[in-house]
């Protein structure tokens, strides 16, 4: 399928039709960069979905964090249920890179916990890019980090057609080359089992289906997809392509060639270290590298094989690493959401990684070629990026300098107007805020309060609580999943006021919030820049009674610019409403939708109709299963029980266990 099928009951309205037309026109005209300047609640994601549907190109959507990526994934999945919408984020629940601290002579081994489900989703994403034209990949900045070369990866794939002549032993050897393991008892992802002339293979990138190959002598008599849990055959297949378990799988001949290059570099580096009288470093480097070489010779891989990626990909020294961008076709589209945050992230990754690796090389823990296992530099990213649309309510300087066209979407189809802004004296800000909170609470509306310091947030929360206000404080120690649950409870009315510092400037929508209070708005700085103020004020833009109060004793340049831009948008929306006879309507969004990013590929619905939206999370703050490692441990325990129940033919109990696993995976997606 190469057509994008946009499924929605809405038609573009307000500024959307013109924005969509201009963006499509710009792409067709070959503009390298465009900016969609869209206010909160104007339907920017819907506009981008319409653009993708019209231009019919594979699209990479870059979000600034996993929470927003999960939300976008859920939205695009709903817009394009019949197309390949995939999720590509870092698969580490926990990651401690290897490092050396010379001052204390401390070496910290690499330690990581890999999320098996997200690893499967990453493999599924690259498969979609390689096989389909109708792919939308939602990603984070992890897309600029090194990945196996697509050329090498494609050389490893295994094609099986019905009617092929196929020796069973040769097939099993090929599966071993793909790093699949044989397991006749516990059938899991990236494993296979053999029962006479029947070979069952669980593809590494699949969470829904396994593949059954039935041989008659040395001919493939039948190929079918089946449910690995129940064994039910889903459909017959004419052919199937098996992809490697890892993006770093390398053909044997490439591996042998790479090992020769590593040996040459090792010899040169040892000579250099010995000439500098660094005998300990030389001995350490030789021992570590020779161990890695032996592992690669025997197993085809080693721990930390990515540090030899220069040789495995055949790229010269200093060349950019292969990344997800190398998997994109030439006509792809890049959409950068919240670009004022995302673009600076891309530029920040390289330097921190470089300084850590230089220390490892200097003290003999790694060869100098390990420096080429790195994220892309900003200039390299610019060179490889396809046609780009920046999406933001407050575009940054980079977008302003590079956008060939700025497309405005400041009119909301709902007719909602930007919040009215009031400036009140900072001297009496706390008492004034308290009276405003009581007014809003009486109307069952919610309030966001943003402060400058953690101490002030804590003190303000205590003060409000002492005066009978139902209040919670959102701080950096709260993990992503619980943060989403707190926002959910704010919307449900479990409490009325949420206090924070860098509070929800970009992210989840809360139509129930009618007041945003910004304390000490006249203190110039990152948290009170014009962009920060506009983003924070925008949190009240989805409520009919939306209002923002800036507590300040003077008007700063940032305040002036933020107020001016908000007023400009208000005037444009009011004029549009008058012209079209629109009466503003509040946004009523189902509270469950806040978790829409947690729609998990792999949750099987009872009717087996593709991906199902997982069940709602309960709105309580659980004392257990807070950290990703705890959730993962619980998932593994439940999976063992589920497969045991399936082996015992207790399929109803296994299905209940599967649904519970689906709920836990929802939580992991947003972490």
Swiss-Prot record:
It is found in: Cytoplasm. It comes from Pseudomonas syringae pv. tomato (strain ATCC BAA-871 / DC3000). Residues 429-582 form the Helicase C-terminal domain. Its main location: cytoplasm. This is UvrABC system protein B. The beta-hairpin motif is involved in DNA binding. Residues 614-625 have a biased composition (Basic and acidic residues). A motif (Beta-hairpin) lies at residues 91-114. Residues 632-667 form the UVR domain. ATP binds at residues 38-45. Residues 25-412 form the Helicase ATP-binding domain. It comes from the Bacteria. GO terms for molecular function: ATP binding; ATP hydrolysis activity; DNA binding; excinuclease ABC activity.
